[in-house]
Curated annotation (Swiss-Prot):
<feature type="active site" description="Cysteine persulfide intermediate">
    <location>
        <position position="207"/>
    </location>
</feature>
<keyword id="KW-0963">Cytoplasm</keyword>
<keyword id="KW-0819">tRNA processing</keyword>
<dbReference type="GO" id="GO:0103016">
    <property type="term" value="F:tRNA-uridine 2-sulfurtransferase activity"/>
</dbReference>
<dbReference type="InterPro" id="IPR023382">
    <property type="entry name" value="MnmA-like_central_sf"/>
</dbReference>
<feature type="binding site">
    <location>
        <position position="134"/>
    </location>
    <ligand>
        <name>ATP</name>
    </ligand>
</feature>
<dbReference type="Pfam" id="PF20259">
    <property type="entry name" value="tRNA_Me_trans_M"/>
</dbReference>
<protein>
    <recommendedName>
        <fullName>tRNA-specific 2-thiouridylase MnmA</fullName>
        <ecNumber>2.8.1.13</ecNumber>
    </recommendedName>
</protein>
<dbReference type="InterPro" id="IPR004506">
    <property type="entry name" value="MnmA-like"/>
</dbReference>
<keyword id="KW-0820">tRNA-binding</keyword>
<dbReference type="Pfam" id="PF20258">
    <property type="entry name" value="tRNA_Me_trans_C"/>
</dbReference>
<dbReference type="GO" id="GO:0000049">
    <property type="term" value="F:tRNA binding"/>
</dbReference>
<feature type="disulfide bond" description="Alternate">
    <location>
        <begin position="110"/>
        <end position="207"/>
    </location>
</feature>
<keyword id="KW-0067">ATP-binding</keyword>
<feature type="active site" description="Nucleophile">
    <location>
        <position position="110"/>
    </location>
</feature>
<keyword id="KW-1015">Disulfide bond</keyword>
<dbReference type="InterPro" id="IPR046885">
    <property type="entry name" value="MnmA-like_C"/>
</dbReference>
């Protein structure tokens, strides 16, 4: 590589195979690569069952793995402690949202407020030209001079949904080295290089809820017995009682404790009245939704956008019309009714492979 193309790049290292391979590839391309892991949560109070290990990211074990990989490929490595900021910007929001009767997505908030804000700022302090991550997403610069965010080439691993908040300034300083690869290719590259994390499992759970028991976590944060109340139908008929609105999310069927001739699902959560609203499956259907905090990777042309949207990560994109409002909100109409529109989740707008933008679901239409 010619010297003029050599860049200083900070790579966010989680200790997993993806960011490890991304770091190795950037080093092999001749760049000056600096590995950084974020310490965001104290795992001292969590112990995995004997012989088992939590499938999460950002633990001390993961940081140790990242450090060893950095040593193996020959790059400097640092740990930045963002525990206080992560608590304030991600965890407190997660807890507050559940107690408002909403179902949050902390991974999007972490990307928005920590990784591509605080860590990107740290990269700039180190004089880096770019921050690279192991996300399966693509970034291209169009003929219009603007940066465009695209799905990762591997549809099974695409993580563009979690990145919809990225701005032009952030994209200009971000690299996704794995965007054109499949997971199988990444593991093969790791094995070929003898990286110790080549066969390491993938993180599955929320990093600060490693046992996936979010109810336990919320009750440790706020106490037990809070937000208890009635289970009602759409007409207000009382069908039972519940131990806390935060225990329920739209679409949930299990754990209602109600004997009823037809299957009932959670169709709404009214935290103010401490009510969990249930109904048959057809009451889960919505013709659209309202969204707040709507942001656009590339500014839309006009007040109406024809797109497809995902209302949760594993949701298949569906055709929709987005009515853009001046106050940063939007009204989204589906072409066909969709199930389980969940307040607090992210709605992300696509056109083919391109991420147009997204926002946070406020309510259903």
């Amino acid at each position: 590589m010619a010297e003029k193309h050599r860049q200083r790049i900070v790579i966010a290292m989680s200790g997993g195979v993806d960011s490890s391979v991304a770091a190795a590839l950037l080093k092999e391309e001749g760049h000056e690569v600096i590995g950084i892991s974020m310490q965001v949560w104290d795992y001292a109070n969590f112990a995995a069952p004997e012989g088992e290990k939590f499938d999460t990211c950002c633990s001390l074990d993961d940081i140790h793995d990242a450090r060893r990989v950095a040593e193996q490929i020959g790059i400097p490595f640092y740990v930045v402690n963002f525990e206080e900021e992560f608590r304030r910007l991600v965890i407190d929001d997660f807890v507050d949202e559940y107690f408002r009767g909403r179902t949050p997505n902390p991974c999007v908030r972490c990307n928005q407020r920590v990784k591509f804000e605080l860590l990107l700022h740290k990269a700039r302090e180190l004089g880096a030209d770019f921050l690279a991550t192991g996300h399966y997403a693509r970034r291209v610069r169009g003929e219009d001079g603007l940066y465009h965010l695209l799905r990762g080439l591997d549809p099974a691993k695409d993580q563009s949904y979690f990145l919809f908040t990225l701005t032009q300034d952030q994209l200009a300083r971000t690299l996704f080295p794995l965007g054109e690869m499949t997971k199988e290719q990444v593991r093969r590259l790791a094995a070929e290089r003898g990286l110790r994390v080549a066969e390491k499992g993938e993180s599955q759970e929320i990093c600060f809820v490693p046992d996936d028991d979010y109810v336990r976590f919320l009750e440790e944060e706020r106490g037990t017995g809070l937000m208890a109340g009635e289970i009602v139908d759409r007409k207000g008929n009382v069908l039972g009682r519940h131990g806390g609105t935060y225990r329920y999310t739209v679409g949930q069927r299990r754990g209602l404790g109600i004997a009823h001739p037809t299957p009932l699902y959670v169709v709404g959560v009214d935290a103010e009245r401490r009510q969990v609203i249930v109904g048959p499956a057809e009451e889960l259907l919505a013709t659209g939704l309202t969204a707040t905090e709507v942001t656009w990777v590339v500014p839309p042309q006009g007040q109406t956008v024809e797109a497809s949207c995902k209302i949760r990560y594993r949701h298949q994109p569906v055709p929709c019309t987005v009515a853009v409002r001046a106050d940063g909100s939007a009204e989204v109409r589906f072409r066909q009714p969709e199930k389980s529109v969940t307040p607090g989740q992210a709605v992300v707008f696509y056109r083919d492979d391109e991420v147009l933008g997204g926002g946070w679901i406020e309510g259903r239409l």
